[in-house]
Amino acid sequence: MGSFSIWHWLIVLAIVVLVFGTKKLKNIGSDLGGAVKGFKDGVKDGSTSTDTPAAAPGQVAGQTAADKTTIDVEAKQKG
């Protein structure tokens, strides 16, 4: 009674699919995968950024013209 059989899990899965739908579950999976990838990239970038020397106090690190560029975008509504 304490452990669930495969039939219990299949019934739970069927109910979840009926409630949320396959499209919503696919979007959740994609979002979760993107978050994991972003976390891994952040951890990797964090370990390499300590290797670069820091600018001396009072000095500004080299900035490129791309830092001063503004990009105008609009958000799209899902629907």
UniProtKB/Swiss-Prot annotation:
The keyword Ribonucleoprotein does not apply. Residues 43-79 are annotated as: Disordered. Residues 69-79 have a biased composition (Basic and acidic residues). The chain crosses the membrane at residues 1-21. One of its GO terms (cellular component) is TAT protein transport complex. GO terms for molecular function: protein transmembrane transporter activity. It is a single-pass membrane protein. It is found in: Cell inner membrane. One of its GO terms (biological process) is protein transport by the Tat complex. Pfam families: TatA_B_E. It comes from the Bacteria. InterPro entries: TatA/B/E, TatA/E. Keywords: Cell inner membrane, Cell membrane, Membrane, Protein transport, Translocation, Transmembrane, Transmembrane helix, Transport. HAMAP family: TatA_E (MF_00236). Part of the twin-arginine translocation (Tat) system that transports large folded proteins containing a characteristic twin-arginine motif in their signal peptide across membranes. TatA could form the protein-conducting channel of the Tat system. The Tat system comprises two distinct complexes: a TatABC complex, containing multiple copies of TatA, TatB and TatC subunits, and a separate TatA complex, containing only TatA subunits. Substrates initially bind to the TatABC complex, which probably triggers association of the separate TatA complex to form the active translocon. Belongs to the TatA/E family. This is Sec-independent protein translocase protein TatA. It comes from Delftia acidovorans (strain DSM 14801 / SPH-1). The lineage of its organism: Bacteria, Pseudomonadati, Pseudomonadota, Betaproteobacteria, Burkholderiales.
